[in-house]
A protein has these predicted regions:
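Short charge-dense sequence patches
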Residues: 1-2, 23-31, 74-75, 84
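Intrinsic-disorder/low-complexity, polar/charged segments enriched in Ser/Thr/Lys/Arg/Asp/Glu/Gln
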Residues: 1-5, 60-62
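Compact, glycine-rich, soluble single-domain proteins
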Residues: 7-44, 48-57
Length: 85
């Protein structure tokens, strides 16, 4: 399993548009991709679960990938977070 921590920089946090884009990115991989905030872990492939975390600006999340293509998944997701969140 590979993971990274990220502090959300955008004012609106993870709202509908970037959440949808993030789910789309996560679905490209066979690995299970998750996000954790305040001890609650949700799959990145489930939009409503992701939105239920209520991630806001300044929150620190942990993104993890576990599976055969976890290295590629983490690289792609980290780049997505840095570019969009």
């Amino acid at each position: 399993m590979k993971s990274f921590e990220y502090t959300i920089k955008v004012e609106l946090g993870i709202h509908a548009r970037p959440a949808g884009m993030l789910v789309k990115e996560a679905k490209k991989f066979a690995s299970e991709c998750t996000i954790t905030k305040d001890g609650k872990t949700k799959k990145l492939t489930q939009l409503m679960m992701l939105m239920s975390l209520g991630v806001k600006q300044g929150d620190t999340v942990t993104v993890a990938a576990n599976g055969e293509d976890e290295d590629a998944a983490i690289e792609t997701l980290k780049a997505f977070f840095e570019a969009n969140l």
